[in-house]
Amino acid sequence: AERIRYKYSIKNVTGLNLLPFVRFDDPFEIIAHLMVGSEGTLAFLSEVTMKTEYDYPYKASAMLYFKTIKEASRAVVAMKKLVDETGEWTVKGAEMLDYKSLSSVNDPVFLKYKGEVASSALPGVEPGDETGLTAVLTETKARTPEELQQNISAIEACLQAFTTYIPVRFTDRPEEYSKYWAIRSGIFPSVGGTRQPGTTCLIEDIAFHIEDLPEATAELQQLIARHGYNDACIYGHALEGNYHFIINQSFSTQAEVKRYEDLMNDIKTLVVDKYDGSLKAEHGTGRNMAPFVCHEWGDDAYKAMKAVKELFDPQGLLNPGVIFNDDPQCHIKNFKPLPLLVMSDKRQATSLVADKCIECGFCEVNCLSCGFTLSSRQRIVLQREISRLKQSGE
């Protein structure tokens, strides 16, 4: 029971949800909570009722810049400890953006930093090495303007112990802080849009315990670079120890597949073996992490998960291969191709734009044709399949 509680003291959706077994005695409550995050492996959910959290009326945000990712992580750990007189966390959000994330959106502070590094104007930073700059988009919320100002003052006092690249400046003006959050929300499609044509944009989702964040974050960045993913980025919910990292991967040769396999094995070693973290923090185990569920949880917990699966789905009909997969190499098989579009000369300009699409679906909320005919993403998916069939001769 203590092991289960410890694993869920941070975000964790690796495997089935075991927390209900230590939180509830009522079988109905256990079953209902088991369904959350089961990814269709136990049952089909036709309807869900969600409760929303309180929306604080007063908010302020600041984009904090640090010269190293380790210093940024230390600041996050310190801010995590801030609480007000009622016991509420002072900082409600801290989103980390590494140098590649900032570069992908042409962040003006990053461009300034890059210029100073290039001209050797920053003491202690190697000329031309802009890889250290890291931003932490920090948010605080309150019920009154006075409470908001108290929160800002507490955070500013906390940050005096750390070296920032530019002075700390909070803003409570929506027209200003909305620009910060637009940068954050645009990272995934922006990084994906810079990938080499024909490669696949992959995003993973891990979590560390907050006390391990400074060392673990720096080691994660070094690990990804060591495998040659020079266009990769790390960003995400640092306040929860939860990061996403994006890599642009080719699967066109066996050597590239092997490079990806080696990366995932080293990620497993870093996250699980060294820091006892979560290989999947919030977006589901799927097939890519299915081979590592037992490694993260251990034999006893994995057997308990399989016993639950057999109770609900003894014939293995529901979402086969997801979460539970007997093939230890299922994550390096059956890759979804993203072929370059084959179009007429007149439509070549269109194909160059469409080839950048990573099929994230973020465009569909603004798509004028979605729901009437095909959405823009569906059109690109179909065009890619047509191109694949033409290229393969099928």
Residue ranges and their predicted role:
Residues 38, 212, 234-241, 256-259, ...:
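Secondary-structure capping and boundary motifs in well-ordered enzyme cores
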Residues 41, 75, 266, 304-307, ...:
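Generic recognition of well-ordered alpha-helical segments
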Residues 275-281, 314-318:
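Alpha-helix capping/hinge segments and adjacent helical runs
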